[in-house]
Amino acid sequence: MKRLKNELNALVNRGVDRHLRLAVTGLSRSGKTAFITAMVNQLLNIHAGARLPLLSAVREERLLGVKRIPQRDFGIPRFTYDEGLAQLYGDPPAWPTPTRGVSEIRLALRFKSNDSLLRHFKDTSTLYLEIVDYPGEWLLDLPMLAQDYLSWSRQMTGLLNGQRGEWSAKWRMMSEGLDPLAPADENRLADIAAAWTDYLHHCKEQGLHFIQPGRFVLPGDMAGAPALQFFPWPDVDTWGESKLAQADKHTNAGMLRERFNYYCEKVVKGFYKNHFLRFDRQIVLVDCLQPLNSGPQAFNDMRLALTQLMQSFHYGQRTLFRRLFSPVIDKLLFAATKADHVTIDQHANMVSLLQQLIQDAWQNAAFEGISMDCLGLASVQATTSGIIDVNGEKIPALRGNRLSDGAPLTVYPGEVPARLPGQAFWDKQGFQFEAFRPQVMDVDKPLPHIRLDAALEFLIGDKLR
């Protein structure tokens, strides 16, 4: 009888143990590394002070234990959890070093099911959770698959106004007079491509988000490869599309076209076939605050980047993405990060603003039956809330330490617009977002957070039932 029960248990084990591959990405400086570090830290400390009341399995005391286990794919770098934790608990505390490529960490979550049928056969189940971190810049490359070289060139050069126009001056000067039909000059093309890469790096340093091709700023082991030595044709209209289309692969324009096609076919498709195809759930982190600080060009650039990124999540049967990869993602969460960098009364506005930015995608996802949500969170809470008296008026404020020099600050950053800001908002410039470093924290206690448990409930809660 005991042997029969053991065999039945083993059979049920195979039936109820679950595997979930969660992808984490975000626009530049959105806090991906801090998010994953904090999420893992909370789960590993469910019996040591973790605050996760919104995760139903914890609230109902059904999550029995969590441990790290070896990842299945030995070819993917390990996520630097321990290193990130050491930085957060350091003296002085620091934000974790951002990751620059794909990395992964794997957890086993042991839980009691509240499913009556499963409970009848088995006391506990296990969820194997694989958390995969990858750069948002790579996701932003996906729309290139729906373009040819000349249409992509038009889009890129069409952005070169305002500050982008200033920052691209060297590239435009170097590409001046380049003959599309002349025999390919590889050295000159490499030099001009380097100038385009410098321009993209400058855009990223200045807080812009729409950067293509994404691998140019995060090349990894592809640094110096000809696949990363192309750039948009600078003056499509001057030469005319028909003439440029005639350029064979041994000409300047032809070689750039060939490299663009190779990049799309091998690099972009390769990433999505090897990684994205295997994701079950996806969270996209967005920092809405820094662009509000930087001005209308930075904010509109973030909006453009999100619009492009959303093209990656159009799940309709007829879309390019569906035809190529048949993705299985069934839940998509957008999170406005750094909720601790604004006062509590502005949290709802943060979420509302992000909802406005992704409204079209939300409608598409709902139509396709994809479960999608939007929330505000702070992976690691860096400030405390309080009330200050200003000329007899009590207003909410934040206390923390400034990121640049650690100086203590008490500030009211201002109001976050609940809708896409118009010219009146920019004219007033009443919002002043300050970057904070992490608080000094007790190494024996889990990291403080805001609504990280709400994100966990949406992303994995149904798998722990």
UniProtKB/Swiss-Prot annotation:
UniProt modified residues of type N6-acetyllysine: K249
Catalysed reactions, semicolon-separated: GTP + H2O = GDP + phosphate + H(+)
UniProt cross-references to InterPro entries, sorted A to Z: YcjX-like
Pfam families assigned to the protein according to its UniProt record, in alphabetical order: DUF463
Regulation of activity: Alternates between an inactive form bound to GDP and an active form bound to GTP. Likely activated by a guanine nucleotide-exchange factor (GEF).
Residues binding GDP: G31, K32, T33, A34, W95, T99, K338, D340, H341, V380
UniProt keyword rRNA-binding, yes or no: no
General function of this protein: Binds GTP and GDP. Has intrinsic GTPase activity. Does not hydrolyze ATP. May act as a transducer of stress responses.
Subunit structure: Monomer in solution.
Name assigned to this protein: Ras-like GTPase YcjX
Upper taxonomic lineage: Bacteria, Pseudomonadati, Pseudomonadota, Gammaproteobacteria, Enterobacterales
